[in-house]
Amino acid sequence: MYHYMTVASTSQRKPKGRYHHGDLREALIEAALAEVASNGPEAVSFSALARQLEVSQAAPYRHFADCDMLLAAAATRAFADFNAHLQAVVARRRKGSDLARMAHAYVAFGLRHTGTYRLMYASRHLADAPIDSPLHQAAEAGFLYFMSLLDVGEAGAERGEKRRARVAIKLLAGLHGVVMMAEQGLLPPRVQKVTMAELVDDLVRDAETAMEQTA
C-alpha cells in the first residue's frame, strides 16, 4: 500500500554557507535549489545567495544574466535528478507494474518536495525556455521515459506511438492534478492518503486499458 506525505519534507540539499573558492556557478545552482526546496522559487534572489555564499553582489552575474536564468539552470538540474530518481524507483521492482511504481513515485515526490516540484512544473521557466534548451531537453527526457513504460501492444508502430504519447499526456495531467490539488488543499477533507493512492492506481489502470485498445 502506498502512503503519501502531504507536507513537504526537509530537502536533502542543505543551504551552503561560505563559498570557499571553486565552481561558483555550481554553488549558485545548489544554493538556489536548497532555497527553492525550503521556501519556493519566488524566494530565490541574487542578493541573498551572494550574502549566503559570501561573494560580491556582482559575482552571480558573471555566471547568469539574471535570477530567471539561474532558476532555469536549477530547474534543469531538478528535472535530471527527478528523472534519475524515477528510474531508480522503477528498477527496484518491489510491487506493481513499472508504470504504477513510476506514477506513485511521481506523486510522492510532488507532495514531499513542493517547492522543487513547483519550480519544475508550475512556474514559467519551462514555458519561456527555448525549445532546444537544456531545460526542455531534461523535461522531455522524463516524458519519453514515461512513454517507454506504456506498452503499444499489437498496434502498428506509428499508431502505437501516437496513442502512447496521447495516453502519457493524459496520465501525467491526472498525476499533476492530484499533486496540485493536494498541495493546495483542494481535495475534500474526507479524502484519506490511501484514497489518493487508489486514485493514482485508477489513473494507471485507465492508461493501461487505453493502451490495450486496438482502435
Each model region followed by its residue ranges:
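Amphipathic C-terminal alpha-helical segment
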Residues: 148, 152, 171-190, 206-215
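Amphipathic alpha-helical packing segments from all-alpha helical-bundle domains
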Residues: 130-155, 165-169, 194-209
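N-terminal intrinsically disordered/low-complexity leader segments
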Residues: 1-23, 212-215
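Short secondary-structure transition hinges
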Residues: 108-148, 180, 189, 193
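An amphipathic alpha-helix adjacent to DNA-recognition modules
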Residues: 22-30, 37, 42-43, 54, ...
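Append "Primarily bacterial transcriptional regulators
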Residues: 44-51, 60
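Hydrophobic alpha-helical connector segments
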Residues: 73, 87-116, 140, 161-171
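Small-residue (primarily alanine) positions within well-ordered alpha-helices
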Residues: 31-32, 50
